Regions:
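Extracellular repeat-rich scaffold modules on cell surfaces
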Residues: 43-45, 49, 136-233, 273-368, ...
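Detector for repetitive beta-architecture
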Residues: 38, 76, 88, 95, ...
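Short, charged juxtamembrane terminal tails flanking transmembrane helices
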Residues: 549-552
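Solvent-exposed adhesion/ligand-recognition segments of exported proteins
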Residues: 34-127, 131, 137, 458-526
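Short, Lys/Arg-enriched N-terminal segments with co-localized hydrophobic residues
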Residues: 1-5
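Gram-negative bacterial Sec-dependent N-terminal signal peptides
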Residues: 7-34, 537, 541
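A short, hydrophobic C-terminal helix/tail in secreted or cell-surface proteins
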Residues: 529-547
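Extracellular beta-strand/loop-rich repeat segments of large surface/secreted proteins
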Residues: 284-298, 319-322, 346-351, 358-469
Length: 552
């Protein structure tokens, strides 16, 4: 028998696969497991074409090898190099499943996949069992859109979900990639939120999301635009900006919630990347970090209300809220190569769990407008270098429960720890003491003896302690117990307690200065001798017994 041609091989594999699927071949193991086929969307004409139309598919990009059927859940779909009339792939059923989805080289506005009328009155799902990949083609444009397109309806609506195992944008090239020197654009837009017929939309990635990494040395844009009600990345969002380019995720629906398992910068060469609301649209969105226990992710980039603008924003109502819900650690250092200019933080940062660190000292003073809510987790100021003092600025803050971190014990020993600054009012809500956690990044407790810090005697008067170190500043206080021990100095140990410290005790005080507000300071003393501890316990027992007798 002569050698089978590629076209004949594809046809043969399809026949075998369909025979196995539909019972034409009953004996298990008669044929080996077949690799998935690559299907190219090559419709006969422009406009909107249904997924189920066999003639819209080929086994090669040129369309010279027509497919025998539409793709199945084992097959990879390619939608590439469309620069002429707009082509739209309509999902022709409420549930569509494929292996991978690859797009590349499409001009702006020329390529999209849409949910159509089959989605109406359904919870429609487009499931990709592998990855969605936005590759860099040979030209300057790599654009693609996911959307909805519906014919006349009578009050019908739909909920839509796109779900994939992974997502990559601007990580690899296609067909040799771009070989020139001009600015290239790789933009993937999920636009369901713009359709009123779609009442709820979700974009879910069960693994990691990767932006950038192709290695282009000149100007380039890599953008994921999310206009959905809810986005979820169960893995980690990994971003880098290639060459002198920029990479970003733009939240583009008001009220959008974006849950992610961590945010990580993957290259330090040139940093111009971030997550923010689409500029000048007046949007509010929320990032919810779900970092798993034991993880510690670092990101240096522009996490702000509307990203970078070189001129004042036309709409100043944008807010990016951040919630830390995971048991792990997330660190964000607000940064952009060159200048942050009008980048602003005005949302609410809520720390419910785990550890969350923020450094935003590079923002202009007038753009530090965020609020902090400490509600069970641990928060700390942060500098990406980790050898220099970091600053976390907030307009207001509320401490309910949880703790603040003094993680860099070397900086603390030098009395220059990273500093939390509240430019207006810091409030205490509730009776629970706020922990001041000295545990370092490796989970090791702080031992002052390792840094040759002299300790005051246990029970020493605050005026006798000479190792006071400032860890927080607030212009005004509300709800704290201010027991004055001398002029302008208040005992703060009723509201704060040390943790993650050994062979020493931490005591706290507020120092009030008319010009600078209130400074929270930590002093270190020796631990009490065992006999002193016993005496303290005995005194407490006697006091309790006396109180009970008086109550009878």
């Amino acid at each position: 028998m002569g050698q089978m041609k590629m076209k004949d091989k594809n046809i043969f594999f399809k026949i075998v696969k369909k025979s196995i699927l539909f019972g034409g071949i009953a004996a298990a193991g008669t044929f080996p497991v077949l690799a998935q086929s690559n299907y190219y969307f090559t419709p006969e004409s422009s406009g909107q074409t249904k997924f189920s139309v066999t003639s819209a598919w080929s086994y090669d990009e040129a369309g010279s090898q027509p497919a025998m059927s539409a793709p199945s859940e084992w097959d990879s779909v390619y939608f590439v190099n469309n620069s002429g009339e707009k082509k739209t792939l309509e999902l022709s059923s409420a549930e569509t499943k494929i292996k991978e989805f690859i797009v590349a080289g499409n001009s702006i506005g020329k390529a999209e996949v849409v949910f159509g009328n089959a989605a109406l009155d359904n919870n429609a799902v487009f499931e990709i069992d592998g990855k969605i990949k936005g590759l860099i083609g040979t030209g300057l444009g790599n654009y693609f859109t996911m959307d909805g397109s519906f014919w006349t309806t009578t009050g019908q609506t739909t909920n839509v979900t796109v779900r994939a195992k992974g997502f990559e944008l601007g990580v690899e090239g296609y067909g040799g990639g771009y070989q020139g020197t001009d600015t290239i654009h790789t933009v993937f837009t999920v636009a369901f939120g713009s359709r009123s017929i779609i009442t709820h939309s979700e974009f879910i990635i069960d693994g990691d999301v990767k932006l950038g990494g192709y290695g282009y040395k000149n100007q380039s844009e890599t953008s994921l635009v999310l206009n959905v009600d809810r986005a979820v990345v169960n893995g980690v969002v990994k971003i880098q900006s290639d060459g002198m380019g920029w990479s970003n995720i733009k939240n583009s629906k008001d009220g959008m919630v974006f849950e992610l398992g961590g945010l990580q910068l993957t290259d330090e060469t040139h940093v111009d990347c971030g997550i923010y609301n689409n500029p000048n649209m007046g949007l509010t969105s929320t990032l919810v970090f779900k970092n798993a226990k034991g993880t510690d992710y670092k990101f240096r980039g522009n996490v702000s209300d509307f990203g970078y603008l070189s001129t004042p924003p036309a709409n100043t109502n944008s807010k990016l809220n951040i919630v830390m819900d995971g048991e792990g650690t997330q660190r964000i250092y607000t940064y952009r190569a060159n200048d942050l200019a009008y980048s602003t933080q005005s949302g609410t940062f809520t720390v419910n769990n785990g550890k969350f660190y923020l450094g935003n000292g590079l923002l202009r003073e007038e753009n530090r407008k965020a609020s902090l809510v400490l509600n069970g987790g641990i928060f700390g100021a942060y500098n990406y270098s980790e050898t220099e003092q970091g600053f976390a600025y907030f307009k207001t803050a509320t401490f309910k429960s949880g703790g603040i971190s003094v993680e860099n014990t070397q900086l603390f020993a030098a009395q220059t720890p990273s500093l939390i600054v509240v430019t207006e009012k810091l409030s205490k809500d509730g009776t629970e003491k706020i922990k001041v956690d000295f545990t370092n990044a490796n989970g090791v407790a702080f031992n002052p003896g390792d840094f040759e810090i002299s300790l005051a005697e246990y029970g020493a008067d605050y005026s006798e302690i000479d190792n006071w170190t400032e860890i927080l500043v607030a212009a005004d206080l509300d709800g704290f117990t201010l027991n004055e021990i001398s002029e302008g100095i208040y005992d703060a140990s009723g509201d704060f307690e040390g943790s993650g410290i050994e062979n020493a005790m931490a005591v706290f005080r507020w120092v009030n200065d008319a010009a600078n507000g209130y400074s929270l300071q930590v002093g270190l003393t020796q631990v009490p001798e065992p006999s002193a501890v016993a005496a303290i316990v005995a005194a407490a027992v006697l006091a309790f017994a006396f109180a009970r007798r008086r109550a009878k």
